[in-house]
């Protein structure tokens, strides 16, 4: 696959940002363009630079497509990640307008706040656990829009892993050695999905460290 030229990279990145601002994501993929995952990463990074230049702030990262089945479906060989933006971080109890999103979808997740920057050469499960300041139940919001052809991995990456925001719950101190918990996603008082008997930290963290 031919690498994008600098002009193509800049053009696609500006269109991705314009689409984000107009709440109409991923219009460039309606033309069924084909780009590599590597170029999609470059687009995400270029859009990040544009957003930073206008005053937006990256506060963290999301990790997705952890399971091998999902990676295969998306055309990945490893998990995907995207940036978390300060103005898209919402507190528990917030009221959000559906009109600010495009085909919004939600996932119940666990999020962590780190107490230090991570040194890649030192990363293992024990190091990660010692680096956790607080643990939070969260709701991640996606703009669930794919206009291109499958697999959709490059489209997902170019659109910041289709991340559109996160609602963060109350904190729990991170020095938990072992605990079993449940996680539920409830919409209009109806349980949409549930995960029972999840063991912290192994069911939440170890797969991400190993991948």
Name the predicted role of every residue range.
Residues 211:
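Glycine-rich phosphate/ribose-binding loops and adjacent secondary-structure elements
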Residues 2-206:
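Catalytic-core "active-site belt" of small-molecule-metabolizing enzymes
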């Amino acid at each position: 696959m031919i690498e994008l030229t600098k002009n193509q990279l800049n053009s696609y990145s500006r269109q991705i940002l314009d689409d984000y601002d107009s709440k109409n994501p991923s219009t460039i993929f309606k033309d069924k363009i084909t780009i590599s995952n590597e170029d999609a990463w470059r687009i995400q990074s270029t859009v990040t630079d544009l957003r930073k230049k206008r005053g937006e702030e990256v506060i963290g990262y999301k990790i997705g497509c952890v399971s091998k089945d999902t990676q295969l479906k998306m055309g990945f060989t490893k998990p995907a990640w995207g940036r978390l933006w300060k103005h898209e971080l919402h507190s528990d109890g917030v009221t959000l307008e559906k009109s600010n999103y495009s085909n919004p979808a939600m996932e119940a997740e666990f999020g962590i706040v780190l107490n230090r920057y991570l040194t890649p050469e030192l990363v293992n499960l024990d190091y990660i656990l010692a680096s956790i300041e607080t643990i939070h139940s969260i709701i991640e919001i996606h703009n669930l829009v794919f206009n291109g052809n499958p697999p959709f991995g490059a489209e997902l990456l170019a659109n910041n892993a289709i991340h559109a925001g996160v609602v963060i719950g109350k904190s729990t101190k991170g020095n938990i050695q072992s605990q079993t918990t449940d996680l539920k996603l409830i919409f209009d008082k109806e349980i949409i999905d549930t995960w029972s008997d999840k063991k912290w930290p192994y069911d939440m963290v170890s797969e991400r460290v190993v991948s």
